[in-house]
């Protein structure tokens, strides 16, 4: 009888170890849903009527997280739809909205767990760049357009825009939990408060972003590196946008699928910022201050 019991315990132990090993690699599918008008309104951006008419009422993008015991990668899946039936098209505005998908846009993110490193790989001006990054909480570059982009701007005003004061950030961890893809997730609410002028009156406006994370997978990750508090983030929910894990499949993942390409050109955050500022100057000049103007410039992958 004792031998039978020990044999059963041995089988259960082996099964438990095998199951644990199985859950150290796999693929998680994410879906990002964006309501552009609500998203821009939440950031205080005044939308011209012509631009609003071209906006889809909602846009969906898909992303995939691949992970194994040592590395992970997060990148867009080539399948996008919007409520206007534009499929993968949607014109310039559709492409612009996809550039904000989960803050991933057309970027690829590569993680190494041992040293907690994160790099971003993206194309800009026909060149593939790689930039050192990291998980952090930075609501200024979070889910909204933020930064005063297009906010109450006069197209004929060539003066240097006034600096925008950074928002006040408060993180509230609640006792709430919910199941996402069979994993227990905990809630952290990020409250971002900034001063805005509404109807010629200065008011404090607070945006809330709900982050749902799990510690069951054993590694740190967020579909938006600027919206991370701890653990593996499986859902980010804000006004007018959300990114949520829809499914998880535990399977073998090769190292080459989660390793950054070696031929990309290195770029620092400061160099990237300078390039983007120069691009925005050309963008405003070509389009007379109108997003998506005559120059047709589309800027992808904000949130770096």
PLM regions and their residue ranges:
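Bacterial Sec-dependent N-terminal signal peptides
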Residues: 1-28, 302-304
């Amino acid at each position: 009888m004792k031998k039978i019991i020990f044999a059963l315990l041995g089988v259960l132990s082996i099964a438990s170890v095998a199951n644990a090993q199985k859950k150290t690699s796999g693929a998680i599918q994410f879906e990002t849903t964006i309501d552009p008008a609500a998203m821009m309104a939440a950031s205080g951006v005044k939308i011209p009527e012509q631009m609003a008419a071209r906006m889809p009422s909602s846009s969906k993008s898909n992303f995939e997280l691949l992970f194994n015991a040592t590395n992970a990668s997060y990148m867009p899946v080539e399948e996008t739809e919007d409520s206007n039936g534009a499929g993968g098209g949607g014109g310039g505005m559709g492409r612009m909205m996809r550039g904000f998908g989960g803050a991933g846009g057309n970027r690829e993110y590569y993680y190494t767990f041992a040293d907690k490193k994160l790099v971003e790989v993206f194309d800009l001006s026909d060149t593939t760049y790689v930039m050192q990054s990291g998980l952090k909480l930075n609501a200024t570059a979070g889910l909204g357009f933020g930064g005063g982009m297009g906010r109450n701007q006069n197209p004929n005003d060539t003066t240097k825009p006034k600096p925008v004061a950074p928002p006040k950030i408060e993180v509230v961890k609640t006792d709430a939990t919910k199941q996402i893809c069979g994993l227990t997730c905990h809630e952290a609410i990020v409250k971002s408060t900034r001063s805005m002028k509404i109807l010629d009156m200065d008011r404090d406006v607070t945006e809330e972003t709900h982050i749902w994370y799990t510690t069951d997978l054993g590694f740190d990750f967020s579909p938006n590196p600027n919206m991370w508090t701890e653990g593996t983030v499986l859902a980010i929910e804000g006004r007018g946008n959300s990114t949520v894990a829809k499914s998880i499949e535990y399977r073998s993942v090769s190292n080459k699928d989660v390793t950054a390409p070696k031929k990309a050109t290195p770029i620092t955050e400061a160099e990237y910022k300078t390039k983007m500022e120069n691009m925005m100057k050309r963008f405003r000049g070509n389009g007379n201050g109108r997003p998506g103007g005559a120059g047709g410039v589309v800027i992808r992958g904000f949130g770096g």
